[in-house]
A protein has these predicted regions:
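Conserved class I S-adenosyl-L-methionine
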Residues: 1-49, 52-61, 148-173
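Class I SAM-dependent methyltransferase SAM/SAH-binding core
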Residues: 62-108
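A short SAM/SAH-binding and catalytic strip from SAM-dependent methyltransferases
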Residues: 119-131
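A short glycine-rich, Lys/Arg-flanked "PGG" loop and its adjoining helix->strand segment in the class I
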Residues: 133-148
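Short alpha-helix
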Residues: 173-189, 195
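Conserved Class I S-adenosyl-L-methionine
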Residues: 191-260
Length: 260
């Protein structure tokens, strides 16, 4: 997907850069560490899955859903384009003999490379895929009982709305959203269900400088006034014992359907 300047993001077109990103990301993770907000999403996913099911997970990343899936299904297959990710997951789940791994891009998966599974699921894994409809066809083809797409969505952190509306900055608002998937599925004659899940994330910063620097990254302008950022952040920040906390309410969407 093209960025706000009409260019393909480097990580989308450069497999080596993407691999470096994941290799570096997992070094900063404690073994088995997941994002706290993912637990609430998984509780909704779990409602569609039975203990005897086989599940195929697309782009598991550092295991937000992989780890709980492994504890709740008969068979789990993880498909990811990153060697680093698959090695990390294998290391974390050595005792899980019912989990297998396929190193491949989902959209390039050969027709006979993996068997159909009861459930096919992918959460926040579509950002590098050019042909989204082809990816959806692949999900529909390989799911025997249900296909599930998960995606975290807006609203964006509220101080960016102030920077946009009050100060006129160009902001990197979320672009690919669950509505796009619903529309593409509709074009495929699939009437999908959609569940919106309210979520909360608390960003924790060691210093004020780290807070301001991190929460300026979605400003697209080449220059900006730091005072504007600080003023926009002020209503949303709590300082406690020298650390800074920013609570952000957002949502996840679960789009799912019975395969046709």
């Amino acid at each position: 997907m093209k960025d706000w300047h009409g260019q393909m993001p480097e990580r989308m077109v450069d497999d080596q850069l993407e691999e470096q990103f994941w290799a570096q990301s997992i070094t900063r993770k404690k073994t088995g560490q997941t994002d706290p907000y993912a637990a609430k999403i998984f509780q909704e996913i779990k409602k569609s899955i039975q203990q005897e099911d086989s599940v195929l997970e697309i782009g598991p990343g550092w295991g937000n859903y992989t780890f709980p899936l492994a504890e709740n299904v008969r068979q789990l297959t993880c498909v990811d384009s990153s060697d680093s990710i698959l090695s990390y997951l294998q290391n974390c789940m050595q005792e899980h003999q019912h989990v297998s791994y396929i190193h491949a891009k989902w959209e390039s998966l050969a027709e006979n490379e993996v068997a159909a599974h009861d459930i096919v699921i992918g959460v926040n894994c579509f950002y590098r895929m050019y042909e989204i409809k082809s990816a959806l066809y692949q999900m529909n083809r390989l799911a025997k009982k249900r296909a599930i797409i998960g995606m975290t969505t807006g609203p964006i952190q509220p101080h960016y709305e102030i920077l946009y509306k009050k100060y006129g900055y160009d902001i990197k608002f979320p672009r690919r959203d669950y509505i796009e998937f619903l529309n593409l599925l509709y074009e495929m004659d699939i009437y999908a269900d959609c569940k919106i899940i309210p979520l909360e994330r608390v960003y924790d910063y060691e210093s004020y400088e780290q807070l301001v620097t991190t929460q300026s990254k979605k400003i697209l302008n080449t220059t900006f006034d730091r005072a504007h950022v600080e003023e926009s952040l002020k209503p949303f920040i709590e300082e406690k014992n020298g650390r800074y906390y920013y609570r952000h309410d957002f949502h996840a969407a679960l789009v799912s359907w019975e395969p046709k």
